[in-house]
């Protein structure tokens, strides 16, 4: 029996009069890769932004329903604490342009005013750059700008920055959509290794990517969760006709 780390219950969300998510109910498995899949505008990104409460940074945003992280309502947590537990990596690599590679890895600590001894800082930087297979590529230029790296390297740096805070869940919003094929493969291989220690939720409309790396797939359409289950079953014998049509390329 799988462990559930996240439970979304009777959840609705939107902006002003626009309802984006409608009655979402889903339980996310611990230390697995779950892909939120569906056509553009279906609500995938809104859903992951709700999971770490970035959604509510928009003044017009609203939600109702519950999201539980290991049994505790995320809406009763301090957002800063929640976002350490539930980290986010965005579609476009976004290392802080004014920070070095070294400082980018430590950005979560710097922003939150957490003081560390040099030995601890060095350990965190090396450990997390190694986790994303970037250490050997940058160890001799740690004090150059993160923005000087290639696109794929920048995205791995952003993942290292998120991992440095030891999150329980890693959210990724189309993390390879702006990368070349080689960098995409590197990120996918990385995620398969990382799931040993962190639960991964990835938003993608790339069906091939979801089939390569996901353990579980949630198909979202027009703001509703149409189908959810083990990836192999979703891809080989979907229960819903809309899921089947999406997977066969009839719309997207």
Where would I find each of the regions flagged by the language model?
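Conserved catalytic motifs of ABC-family nucleotide-binding domains
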Residues: 166
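Catalytic Walker B motif of ABC-type/P-loop ATPase nucleotide-binding domains
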Residues: 170-173
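Conserved ABC ATPase signature
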Residues: 144-149, 153
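Short coil-to-helix segment of the ABC ATPase nucleotide-binding domain corresponding to the Q-loop/switch region
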Residues: 99-108
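Helical segment within the ABC ATPase nucleotide-binding domain
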Residues: 185-196
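Conserved ABC ATPase "signature" region
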Residues: 69-73, 118-140
């Amino acid at each position: 029996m799988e462990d559930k780390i996240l439970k979304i219950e009777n959840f609705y969300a939107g902006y002003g009069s626009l309802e984006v998510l409608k009655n979402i109910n889903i339980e996310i498995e611990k230390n697995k890769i779950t892909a939120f899949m569906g056509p553009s505008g279906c609500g995938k990104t809104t859903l992951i932004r709700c999971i770490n409460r970035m959604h509510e940074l928009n003044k017009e945003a609203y939600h109702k329903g519950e999201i539980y992280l290991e049994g505790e309502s995320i809406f009763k947590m301090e957002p800063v604490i929640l976002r350490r537990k539930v980290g986010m990596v965005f579609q476009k690599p976004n290392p802080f342009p004014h920070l070095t590679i070294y400082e980018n890895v430590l950005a979560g600590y710097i922003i939150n005013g957490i003081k560390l001894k040099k030995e601890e800082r060095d350990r965190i930087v090396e450990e997390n750059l190694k986790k994303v297979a970037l250490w050997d590529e940058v160890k001799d230029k740690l004090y150059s700008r993160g923005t000087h790296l290639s696109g794929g390297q920048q995205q791995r740096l952003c993942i290292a920055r998120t991992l440095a805070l030891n999150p329980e869940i890693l959210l990724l919003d189309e993390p390879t959509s702006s990368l070349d094929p080689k960098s995409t493969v590197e990120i996918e291989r990385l995620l398969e290794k990382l799931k040993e220690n962190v639960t991964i939720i990835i938003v993608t409309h790339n069906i091939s990517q979801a089939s390569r790396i996901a353990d579980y797939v949630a198909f979202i359409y027009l703001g509703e969760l149409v189908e959810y289950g083990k990836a192999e079953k979703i891809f080989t014998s979907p229960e819903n006709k809309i899921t089947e049509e999406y997977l066969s390329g009839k719309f997207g």
